Design a protein with these regions (language model features):
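Mobile genetic element proteins and their domesticated derivatives, centered on retroelements
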Residues: 46-50, 84, 119, 133, ...
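Conserved beta-strand -> loop -> alpha-helix junction used to position metal-binding or nucleic-acid-contacting
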Residues: 177-178, 242, 250-290
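Short, flexible loop/hinge motifs at secondary-structure junctions
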Residues: 1-110, 179-180, 206
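Short, positively charged, Gly/Tyr-enriched micro-motifs
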Residues: 51, 65-176, 408
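Structured ligand/cofactor/substrate-binding pocket environments in proteins
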Residues: 113-117, 123-129, 216-249, 398-405
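Acidic/histidine-rich catalytic cores and adjacent linkers
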Residues: 235, 243-247, 282-438
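Gly/Pro-rich turn-and-neighbor structural signature
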Residues: 2-7, 25, 39, 44, ...
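Short helix/loop capping segments that flank catalytic or ligand/cofactor-binding pockets
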Residues: 56-58, 92-95, 187-189, 212-214, ...
Length: 438
């Protein structure tokens, strides 16, 4: 053994995380607080040393969380009716006066605004399907079938929430930047269609610089007529993926999604042998991915500037992103001539070339985004919820789901508690003259 050979130095990498002391405690300050005091009795307030009376010098506080489970109560609305005994004795016409009582939200049912809001919130915000809510209510001593719960929510959506939904749709159409996306949904009882037929939930939302609005719309197909009809009156930029159905929407400039373009090159890279993926050896998939990464890195750096505005973003993109795009396009056109079109890399190149006019639209306005991730994030709650409840039974139920999801997700985006907001609107809407458009 050559003892003169030095052993390699081992580098120890230590990670230091900032201690988040007090963050949780501070986040509880807005909650109702119950205070319990623990004091010595008069007999115990005696010094163990000299026998004199002690005094309170300080306190120490321990905090803990108390969770109060949901509970169900019955509310009886008793309406009192009055008449005049004097008129009764005189034999004259007796006037009868009935005390005013708020109209029921759902006549002939046990549904209250709070009960309906709770069921909606549990399913569409917390992802709890109706069969599990049915079991949960049974444990609370209430026998409420999932069919009854479904009927309540369909009624609440089609009679009350539809007014908010339609108002939000008008607001969204008045904007000049929007995002769109769509995903499949199964509806069992659609007229003239098999239960296994694929239907669609479409999503439309506002851009980043205005008050958030997220709207879902159920349609039995993925046909081009649906986004065209929903966005009738909208004029401006529409962030989309590569689906051709959006091409027929009138008065819009489509904005392509660089996240989709990047994903194509990422898939092309992953289709290569692992050794080549991890090596420094250049290849087309890596080059395409690097072009996309440069665009995202530039945009991130611009957005992180304290003085970032849409105007600044527009100017900086022309300076920084435009040259990269020019080089990327030249590379795509060259590579297309020598790459097999049906290979993963060929598919990525063709996708970018076919989408190019939409992919460079983000240069036209500093408010536009590089991708449609905002739209994809907005449709994700529906996709996650679908894994729990799997399907809708009827078209009416699917339309109700679209409206409820719209109200819930818009409330969340505006930092509102969905349960509290649903309760509020279901309490207030029956009291409003909804025929007055003003």
């Amino acid at each position: 053994t050559d003892t003169s050979t030095e052993e390699p130095t081992l580098e120890t990498i230590a990670y230091t995380r900032k201690k988040r002391s007090g963050q949780l405690a501070a986040s509880l300050d807005h909650l109702p607080t119950e205070t319990i005091h623990y004091r010595l009795s008069e007999e115990e307030q005696v010094c163990l040393c000299c026998g004199e009376k002690t005094h309170e010098m300080s306190t120490q506080v321990r905090r803990e969380l108390k969770i109060i489970p949901a509970q169900v109560e019955v509310v009886e609305h008793v309406q009192h009716i009055y008449s005049c005994r004097h008129c009764e004795k005189e034999g004259t016409e007796t006037p009868i006066v009935t005390a005013k009582m708020p109209a029921p939200m759902y006549p002939g049912s046990l549904a209250s605004p709070s009960a309906m809001a709770y069921l909606m919130s549990q399913k569409y915000s917390e992802g709890l399907p109706l069969y599990r809510q049915e079991k949960q209510l049974e444990r609370m001593g209430v026998s409420l079938s999932r069919q009854t719960m479904a009927n309540w929510m369909i009624y609440g959506a089609h009679i009350w929430l539809i007014h908010i939904y339609q108002h939000l749709q008008k607001k969204l159409r008045a904007e000049d930047i929007a995002h769109a996306d769509e995903t499949s949904v199964q509806v069992l009882n659609e007229p003239g269609r098999a239960a296994t037929s694929k239907s669609y939930m479409w999503m439309y939302r506002t851009g980043r610089d205005v008050s958030p609005i997220i709207l879902y719309e159920y349609q039995p197909t993925r046909a081009k007529e649906h986004p065209k009809a929903f966005l009738e009156g909208f004029s401006g930029y529409l962030h989309v993926d590569g689906y051709a159905g959006y091409h027929h929407v009138s008065n819009v400039q489509l904005v392509g999604c660089w996240a989709h373009a990047r994903r194509k090159f990422d898939e092309a890279l992953k289709s290569l042998p692992v050794a080549l993926q991890k090596s420094d050896q250049p290849c087309g998939a890596k080059t395409g991915l690097q072009f996309c990464n440069r665009l995202f890195a530039m945009d991130k750096k611009i957005n992180q500037r304290k003085d970032c505005t849409p105007a600044l973003r527009y100017e900086e993109r022309l300076k920084q992103s435009q040259p990269v795009l020019d080089d990327f396009l030249a590379w795509l056109q060259t590579e297309q001539q020598r790459v097999a079109p049906k290979s993963k890399l060929g598919e990525a190149i063709i996708y970018c070339l076919n989408q190019w006019s939409k992919l460079i639209t983000f240069l036209e306005d500093g408010r536009l985004e590089l991708d449609n991730n905002r739209g994809e994030r907005a449709i994700k709650p529906f996709v996650i919820g679908r894994k729990a409840w799997l399907f809708s039974t009827s078209q009416k139920g699917a339309k109700a789901s679209a409206m409820i999801y719209s109200i819930v997700e818009t409330a969340k985006e505006n930092d509102l508690d969905p349960l509290k907001y649903l309760t509020y609107v279901l309490e207030q809407l029956p009291l409003i003259d909804l025929t007055d458009e003003a």
